[in-house]
């Protein structure tokens, strides 16, 4: 097919369920152009929210359907950026509206099933140069609103249980300074280029009374990436000499080591969560190199075992021993 398929299966079962098939959806609509912006499943696994551009305008319509019946549960939301974030109780979605200049400058909260005229304006960016987005922190305690241009960012936060969200500023914007906050295990992490050309990660126990201390200091000619959090682990990335590296930190011991995944000197690793619950030692670890097609492994951070779950098929065939890097 030409478009993505979204599958899911319950943990420890072999029953795979198809909840989205882009080719079938395009055929059903009978449109020439079919752009998918976002596909999000609700926290209770009952709803699928998706955004479509069927004109090539990059203005997306948001739809929400009941997965079990395939029926829409709310009126389509028009003129959005396409991104969708469910509230933790799955009663609402957050989305951003595009203005006439095609910029996302307003964040709204929509109660599923309600009329669109009742949508609540959570945040509005006054500068025409900045665009906004909303996300959930890794510990699912806060929503973060990020407003940014290509080299400056600013973030606001509010609690997931706030009935009437009132976003609070984290750090006032400074020209040329990028920062991105996350929270995990009662700490806040700031991935920023403030006094760190190639970024660093600072840590603070509070956003109300910020006291930022180094967590991963800046390094000369090393690009510091962000963090992925699991119950027992923090996974982060670095890039140096054009090579990507992954580092695994045990939260209880604070011991950190590089994840050496291959004896090849040149390869590109990437990780993704294996399951929604972060109380796990397992991740999906993607891997590719100039001589090896893309592979995805199930990787156990505790015992370092791995299992191949998917490999890119090369129609003409492939033998990695035929190549030298």
Tell me the role of every PLM-derived stretch:
Residues 1-40, 51, 131-183, 214, ...:
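Non-catalytic accessory segments flanking enzyme active sites
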Residues 7-10, 63-68, 108-114, 157-161, ...:
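Beta-propeller blade signature
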Residues 45-49, 93, 143, 188-190, ...:
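Hydrophobic beta-strand positions that form the internal "hydrophobic ladder"
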Residues 67-78, 114-126, 163-171, 209-217, ...:
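Blade-edge beta-strand/turn elements of extracellular beta-propeller
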Residues 183-202, 224-239:
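Loop/turn-rich, solvent-exposed surfaces of beta-rich toroidal or solenoidal domains
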Residues 210-230:
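Generic long, charged, amphipathic alpha-helical segments
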């Amino acid at each position: 097919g030409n478009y993505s398929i979204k599958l899911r299966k319950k943990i420890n079962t072999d029953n795979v369920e198809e909840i989205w098939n882009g080719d079938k959806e395009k055929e059903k609509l009978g449109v020439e152009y079919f752009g998918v912006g976002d596909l999000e499943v609700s926290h209770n696994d009952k709803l699928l929210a998706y955004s479509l551009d069927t004109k090539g305008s990059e203005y997306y319509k948001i739809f929400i359907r009941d997965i079990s019946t395939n029926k829409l549960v709310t009126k389509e939301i028009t003129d959005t950026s396409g991104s969708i974030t469910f509230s933790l109780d799955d009663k609402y979605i957050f989305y951003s509206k595009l203005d006439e200049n095609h910029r996302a400058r307003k964040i709204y909260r929509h109660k599923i099933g309600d009329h669109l005229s009742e949508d609540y304006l959570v945040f509005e960016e006054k500068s025409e140069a900045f665009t906004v987005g909303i996300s959930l922190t890794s510990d699912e305690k806060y929503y973060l609103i990020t407003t940014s241009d290509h080299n400056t960012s600013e973030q606001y936060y509010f609690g997931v249980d706030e009935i009437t969200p009132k976003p609070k500023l984290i750090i006032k914007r400074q020209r040329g300074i990028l920062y991105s906050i996350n929270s995990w295990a009662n700490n806040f992490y700031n991935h920023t280029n403030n006094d760190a050309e190639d970024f660093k990660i600072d840590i603070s126990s509070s956003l109300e009374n910020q006291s930022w201390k180094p967590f991963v200091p800046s390094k000369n000619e090393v690009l510091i990436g962000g963090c992925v959090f699991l119950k027992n682990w923090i996974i982060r990335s670095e890039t140096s000499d054009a090579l990507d590296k992954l580092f695994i930190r045990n939260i209880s011991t604070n011991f950190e080591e590089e994840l050496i995944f291959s004896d090849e000197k040149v390869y590109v690793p990437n990780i993704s969560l294996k399951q929604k619950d972060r109380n796990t030692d397992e991740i999906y670890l993607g891997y590719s190199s100039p001589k090896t097609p893309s592979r995805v492994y199930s990787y156990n951070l505790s015992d370092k075992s791995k299992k191949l779950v998917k490999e890119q098929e090369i129609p003409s065939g492939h033998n990695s021993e035929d190549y030298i890097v």
